[in-house]
Amino acid sequence: MTAAKPNPYAAKPGDYLSNVNNFQLIDSTLREGEQFANAFFDTEKKIEIARALDDFGVDYIELTSPVASEQSRKDCEAICKLGLKAKILTHIRCHMDDAKVAVETGVDGVDVVIGTSKFLRQYSHGKDMNYIAKSAVEVIEFVKSKGIEIRFSSEDSFRSDLVDLLNIYKTVDKIGVNRVGIADTVGCANPRQVYELIRTLKSVVSCDIECHFHNDTGCAIANAYTALEGGARLIDVSVLGIGERNGITPLGGLMARMIVAAPDYVKSKYKLHKIRDIENLVADAVEVNIPFNNPITGFCAFTHKAGIHAKAILANPSTYEILDPHDFGMKRYIHFANRLTGWNAIKARVDQLNLNLTDDQIKEVTAKIKKLGDVRSLNIDDVDSIIKNFHAEVSTPQVLSAKKNKKNDSDVPELATIPAAKRTKPSA
């Protein structure tokens, strides 16, 4: 029996600090996502989103601070009463007044945050590190006394002084937090910086490390993955990455990255086929389109156009796909209605239409399609019309013998018969 080949994209076997095969998700669509410019979630919509996330399998659902507004408090209490499998968290300032309200809502844990960079200490709360440490200890001990989880996070971690960061994390770790948080609040960090900070922090604290990455410079997914490689265990995500400014690590995008590195873990833990429905739910709620190049669910995500690509995909999808669309309840699509098409793609379309043409005839009709494609944009109906007209012209009793040479359906990769729909923004 041939031994299975090792996954070249997996964590290195000897890297015992890596959590690529042992990570957890904190979904913040109902906290960070509420800070997205278009977001307004009423109670009913929050409950619908929370149930969908729970069904998908996220480990934690983070909610807006109950002191943000009276309705925020009521919504927090309502979601806590749903009996979800996911643990419910709320996100508060490092302040006793906030903590006293939060612990009475029924949450499973409280996420405490305070700015530690010189920018936030000067222009936000105006406090020094001694005050921050004292406040953190007071709030943490109070929350712990209520028997619920507690996370302490610095805000703007990557623009904070490293000595200040390590000192505050050592302080809170000693009194027993469940985890400490690293927040790239302005999206300035790159993967190398993330890896180095996480590895340094791992030598200082014994608790789990949670990471929160903004996407201002396009590194949120890469930073999240690198954080797990470095030893962080929990990653904050939101559906479609919605959040303050241009958001944080997207749930679907991170799943695309993680299934490559840890396929067995990801497939066994999360209902990946639910991603499309969850993204549609949230996209409709905030009135945005799902981007065409969105990992997994973008309408071009599994579309192949160039002739040489199509030929290889039809023979073995792994030639041009690192992700299997079937893992996500999706189908690949060969875009054959264009001048770049190849005869193998047209042959697949001929088979879908249940027509019989020889390879030479398929090459001939392909030339006709490419010729028209040089003149104008084509659609599926154009190509089907050319194929059917050509078939009618050449049909003879001899052509029927081509049936004997057709592949069985099981030998041909499953293809979508029409391209994925282009989403349009819902009307107001």
UniProtKB/Swiss-Prot annotation:
Localization: Cytoplasm
Pathway linked to the protein: Amino-acid biosynthesis; L-lysine biosynthesis via AAA pathway; L-alpha-aminoadipate from 2-oxoglutarate: step 1/5
Matches recorded under InterPro entries: 2-IPM_HCS-like, AIPM/Hcit_synth_CS, Aldolase_TIM, DRE_TIM_HCS_fun_bact, Homocitrate_synth, LeuA/HCS_post-cat, PYR_CT
Modified sites of kind Phosphoserine: S385, S401, S410
Any one GO molecular-function label of the UniProt entry: homocitrate synthase activity
Location of the region described as Disordered in the Swiss-Prot/TrEMBL record: 399-428
Note: Present with 28100 molecules/cell in log phase SD medium.
Protein name: Homocitrate synthase, cytosolic isozyme
Natural source organism: Saccharomyces cerevisiae (strain ATCC 204508 / S288c) (Baker's yeast)
